[in-house]
Amino acid sequence: MENKMTKKTILTGLRANNDLHIGNYFGALLPLIDMAKAHAGEYQINLFIPDLHSFTTPIDHSQLQEQIMNNTRLFVAAGLPLDNPDVHIYRQSYIPAHSELTVILNSFTGIGEMLRMTQFKDKSSKLGADRVSVGLFDYPVLMACDILLYGAEYIPVGDDQSQHIEFTRDIAERMNSRFGDLFVMPHEVKKQHEFFGKDQGLRIKDLQDPTKKMSKSDESGKGIIFLSDDPKAAAKKIMGAATDSIGKINLNYETQPGISNLLQILALFTSEPLDNVVARYEGKTSYGDLKMAVAEATEAFLTEFQTNYSHVDMATVEAKLRGSESTMNQIANQTLQNVQKAIGIR
């Protein structure tokens, strides 16, 4: 496959339309930025904003454009290197080839394949039949196009997306077998995990219900710390976090999920190994002291992060987007033309 990129490509999506919280920061923003810094130079890093994916389930469209630009700014505030020529940031909808290739690949995809997708099953069961869109059903085909247009070999995804990587490999192999060498085959999921390595396994939980992950679905907002929260208000949320009646600090996710969550948050905010934090507090009886330490670390983190956010130059961000989109359009259009010629419409 002809590709204007001379380096192998790593591709991943930036969250488009959700208000981001500290769980997103440590679970997605920071790992993504660390990955980009670690591999830029040897690899081309494609970071795209999946705005077409963002409304496969119902959203408030009046907020979408603002959220897209805000979240892009958040990634830059977290350290995304805009000045690195190997790092490309682009909006999915600004590359028409994503949609055009999706229409083509739909005709080479079986309904049965889509019906077997566990993420579709999970989301559709929660939404109900009258709210399930064709876009949600077809999500894996668009995701395959996101990958195949640029010859991406490595795509860091969670377990919930692994099935989509395997589908991407299947459709690439199917098209290559029938029409020749059209697509670069992304590596199998096992090799993806080997390449990116295993994460440290720390997952921030809801402050009020530490048995579940921190999520925007908490309507009260008391269990979530958003990156946009007032630092002092966030510290108060920490002080009001649910704990237990055991009366002694231990790291035990089953019997003391609230205390364990606070220990994890402190480790993440201070960049200390969790074992060191646990050793410092284990066996102590003052939950208040632990909460105070976490609250102070939270306030300090948000104050610094929001200062960085305020200093992000949006003109520079928009210039980076436009430059990346120009480059990506050239690459994607070449791939699309190869496919169009192969199937006989050019």
Predicted regions and their residues:
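N-terminal Rossmann-like or analogous alpha/beta NTP/dinucleotide-binding catalytic cores
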Residues: 2-11, 16-145, 297, 306-307
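Short amphipathic alpha-helical interaction patches enriched in hydrophobic/aromatic residues
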Residues: 18, 56-59, 152, 245-246, ...
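Short amphipathic alpha-helical segments at helix-loop
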Residues: 56, 149, 153-156, 309, ...
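Short helix-capping/linker segments at secondary-structure and domain boundaries
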Residues: 111-115, 149-156, 267-277
